[in-house]
Amino acid sequence: MATITYTVTVASGTNRHGTGNKFYLNGTVSPDINLIEGNTYIFDQSDSTNDTHLLGFSLNDNNDPANVYTTGVTQTGTPGTSGAKTTIVVAAFAPTLYYYCVNHAGMGATAYTLSGGLTSETTTFEKTFPVDDVVEE
């Protein structure tokens, strides 16, 4: 299983929730992301712009109504300080999630969860198939 790190910053921007402060993941404003079950995702919130913007996960878009998702989620430190991060180890059969700011509405987006059967590795199958005719150009 893989570990993927997103650098989280906060700045003014526009997403499907409107304009205002937004989470930026690796420099992109509130992108929808894919989380593969079994993988670990670290949301590094040590940048000072994260102050007061703790990233969490919810079963509802924008956490409205509130339905916090905590399975496999660990929050470390205080956002905006060195070492601050939110980590999620994606559980088997995890539902579609939404990342959001626990203090302010409209900052996040969707975190689609995908089966751990998906990988970035290539599998080669070796099989001989009979050919009836050869087509030549």
What are these regions (language model features)?
Residues 4-15, 25, 50-52, 71-121, ...:
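Extracellular/periplasmic metallocenter environments
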Residues 45-49:
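Acidic, Ser/Thr
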Residues 13-37:
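N-terminal edge beta-strand
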